[in-house]
Every structure is written in structure tokens, then in C-alpha cells.
């Protein structure tokens, strides 16, 4: 039995990117790097360099994700369509409680290696998974997060609590705290890992979804100009004379090309933003959050902040599509109008040609009549000369009588001959 070439790859796809097994206390640093195809290859090579420095095997040539334990820290590397994520996990000892600042997981990674991550940083986040009592939890939240922008909720049906301020701090990182303590409920290490992965994905997909917002704002200028141009063309078409229509059709075609070109360049971005927005909503549903008194939930924050941005992207996409359809309809109407006028011009031209042909036929018949008279005249003249000569030889009729008798015979013969010749020529051209 021959296996399908990609059987194992397809089978193992459902097991790709499994969540980490996590136990508090834990420090996590998460990076999202925008990367094109070349930078994604560089990312794989950059990862191989770190593994080589720690005497670990390199990733496979086509690897799209990797989890590796370096001892002092664990690294999770994932390759996506538009970006690459690096998640650094550092277990903490219980002595972290007495420290002024929470440890950052990125400190355990060679800083020179971090500084050279391929691509452009879209998102960077510090997240801590801790156990703490109510009083200490409030102190940690107050010390590390901005209370005026605080977002918090219980998650996994009350088995943990999550806090963040969705803000960039002076170091360029956003921050989040997850409390999984015995005072709430016992939370398995595997389920805690799934929770943290979903929280990181919410932040990642939120930022990637927002990539469509600058594009939507930039599209507004083009769309406003295009709509104004289309309105001007519509007014001009209403009052245009036939000789102006080709110019209007050319302007309309240029506008259609400009709008379609811009639509093609932005459609994939808007579609991607919509897909990432759906992922954000699904991940929020997955964490099963519930409200903490006095705080907005993640769902509340996204509804107030992210949803309007995504509506702007969707509005730009629908506006582009509507403008394209209106241009197409107007182009079809104008082309139909031009074609009808061309048909009318062609019919008028054919009528004029038929009229000229009838006139030519009448002239031809007139010329034929004159030709019969002229040929008859000359032939009768020749007969008169023959009759004069014949009279000397005893021809009984006078030359005048002979000429008079010859006129009808010659005229009929000439007319009949020209008629046959005309019919022959006509048949040869049909």
C-alpha cells in the first residue's frame, strides 16, 4: 500500500503548536515580529544559531514551530503567514515575592541574539503567572499596571484571574498578570498553559488585526476623490453630446483602473484583518471570562476599542466594492449609449449609400440610353455609306431609304447587346 506523500504531515497538523505545560510562578516574554518570506527564512536561521550556541539540534529545514528547553528558560518559536512569534518562559522561585520588580523572562536569553531578531516588532509583552493572596494581588496590580486603564476578569469559569492595562510602558512592552492561586480553585498545569496561550494570542491577533486600520484610513482619501470624480462624470454624461462621449468613456476607464488597482492591493489586508478579528473573539470566548467588580472585561475593552477599528476596515472594504460596482454600471450604460449611437450612424450611412447606389443606377440607365442612341447613329451612318456604294451596283433602294429602314433594326440590336452584356457583368459579381 502506497502512502499519500503528505499523509503524515496532514495527520500531525492537528497536533501542531500544542500548549505549554505551566506552573506558577512563571515569567513570560512574548514577541511578535512582522516578517516577509525572506525574513521568515532568516528567523529560522537565527533560531538555529541560538540552538547551535547551546549545543542543541537545529530546526528542520521546513519547520514552522519549535519548543526547546534551554535549562534557564524555555523558548517557543512559531512561524505564521505574516509574522513570527517568540515566547520565552522562565520559571521563578518563591523568592520573587521579596523583589522590587518582577523578573523579566527575556533577561535569561542572550541579549545580543534578541537584538537581532529578523523583521519588525509589532508586539512585545511581559506576562507573569503568579500565586498571591488578595492583598498582595492588589499591590502587584497597582505597582505594575496603570489603574486608570485597567482591564481585568476572572477566567476559566473562576479558576484564575487576569489583569492588564493594554498599554505600552516606558520600556516598549505591554504587561499582564495571571493569578492562579489555591484560593480560587485548583488549575491543572496543562489547562493553565492553554489559558496563557490564548491570552497571548488575543494580544497577538489584536495587533495584527489592526494592521488594516492605517490602510483603511489611507483608502478614505482615494475613495472620496473617486466618488467625487464619479459624480462629476455622471453629471457630464447626462448632458454630453455624442462627440464628447469617447472622452468621458476614457475618463471612466481610467477611474475604474485606479479603483480596481487600489482594491486589489488592499483587499487581502482587509480580509486578513477580519480573519484575525474573528480569532480574537473566539479566543475571548475560549477563556470563559466573568466580570470583576469595577473593572471592564477583555470583551468590553475589545468592543469599545477594537470593534470600531474593524468596522472602519469593513466600511472601507464595502465602500471600495460599492464604488467599483457603480463605476462598472456607469461604464456599461455609457458603452451601450455609444454603441447605439454608432449603430444609428451606421444605419444612416447605409441609407445614404443605398440612395447613392439608386442614383448611380438611374444615371447608368440614362447613360445606357444615350449609348444606344450614339452607337445606333454611328452604325446607321456606316449603313448609309454602304447603301450609296450599293446603289451604284444596282441596289434598288436609295441610301436614305436604306438608312431609315436600318435605324429600328440597329437600335434594337444595340439595345439587346448592351442588355446582355450588363446582365453578364452583374452575374459575374454576385
PLM regions: where:
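N-terminal pre-transmembrane cytosolic regions of membrane proteins
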Residues: 1-123
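Cytosol-facing regions at membranes
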Residues: 232, 279, 308, 315, ...
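Alpha-helical transmembrane anchor segments
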Residues: 358-430
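Short, positively charged
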Residues: 168-185, 216-223, 227, 262-287, ...
Amino acid at each position: 500500500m502506497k502512502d499519500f506523500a503528505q499523509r503524515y504531515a496532514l495527520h500531525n497538523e492537528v497536533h501542531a503548536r500544542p500548549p505549554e505545560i505551566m506552573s506558577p510562578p512563571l515569567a513570560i516574554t512574548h514577541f511578535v515580529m512582522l516578517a516577509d518570506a525572506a525574513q521568515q527564512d532568516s528567523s529560522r536561521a537565527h533560531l538555529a544559531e541560538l540552538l547551535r550556541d547551546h549545543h542543541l539540534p537545529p530546526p528542520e529545514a521546513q519547520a514552522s514551530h519549535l519548543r526547546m528547553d534551554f535549562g534557564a528558560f524555555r523558548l517557543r518559536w512559531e512561524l505564521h503567514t505574516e509574522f513570527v512569534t517568540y515566547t520565552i518562559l522562565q520559571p521563578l522561585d518563591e523568592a520573587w515575592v521579596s523583589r522590587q520588580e518582577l523578573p523579566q523572562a527575556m533577561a535569561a536569553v542572550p541579549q545580543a541574539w534578541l537584538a537581532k531578531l529578523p523583521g519588525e516588532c509589532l508586539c512585545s509583552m511581559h506576562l507573569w503567572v503568579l500565586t498571591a493572596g488578595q492583598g498582595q494581588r492588589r499591590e502587584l496590580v497597582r505597582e505594575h499596571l496603570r489603574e486608570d486603564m485597567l482591564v481585568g476578569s476572572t477566567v476559566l469559569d473562576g479558576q484564575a484571574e487576569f489583569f492588564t492595562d493594554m498599554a505600552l510602558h516606558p520600556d516598549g512592552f505591554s504587561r499582564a498578570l495571571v493569578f492562579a492561586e489555591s484560593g480560587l480553585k485548583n488549575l491543572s498545569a496543562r489547562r493553565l498553559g492553554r489559558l496563557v496561550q490564548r491570552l497571548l494570542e488575543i494580544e497577538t491577533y489584536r495587533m495584527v488585526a489592526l494592521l488594516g486600520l492605517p490602510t483603511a484610513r489611507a483608502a478614505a482619501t482615494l475613495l472620496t476623490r473617486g466618488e467625487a470624480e464619479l459624480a462629476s462624470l455622471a453629471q457630464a454624461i447626462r448632458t454630453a453630446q455624442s462627440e464628447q462621449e469617447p472622452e468621458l468613456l476614457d475618463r471612466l476607464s481610467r477611474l475604474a483602473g485606479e479603483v480596481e488597482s487600489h482594491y486589489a492591493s488592499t483587499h487581502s489586508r482587509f480580509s486578513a484583518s477580519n480573519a484575525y478579528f474573528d480569532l480574537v473573539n473566539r479566543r475571548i470566548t475560549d477563556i470563559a471570562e466573568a466580570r470583576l467588580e469595577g473593572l471592564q472585561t477583555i470583551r468590553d475593552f475589545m468592543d469599545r476599542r477594537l470593534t470600531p477599528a474593524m468596522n472602519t476596515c469593513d466600511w472601507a472594504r464595502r465602500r471600495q466594492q460599492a464604488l467599483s460596482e457603480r463605476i462598472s454600471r456607469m461604464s456599461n450604460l455609457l458603452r451601450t449609449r455609444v454603441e447605439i449611437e454608432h449603430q444609428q450612424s451606421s444605419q444612416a450611412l447605409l441609407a445614404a449609400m443605398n440612395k447613392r447606389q439608386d442614383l448611380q443606377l438611374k444615371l447608368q440607365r440614362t447613360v445606357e440610353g444615350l449609348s444606344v442612341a450614339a452607337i445606333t447613329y454611328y452604325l446607321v451612318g456606316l449603313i448609309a455609306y454602304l447603301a450609296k456604294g450599293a446603289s451604284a451596283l444596282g441596289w434598288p433602294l436609295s441610301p436614305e431609304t436604306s438608312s431609315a429602314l436600318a435605324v429600328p433594326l440597329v437600335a434594337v440590336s444595340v439595345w439587346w447587346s448592351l442588355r446582355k452584356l450588363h446582365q453578364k457583368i452583374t452575374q459575374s459579381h454576385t
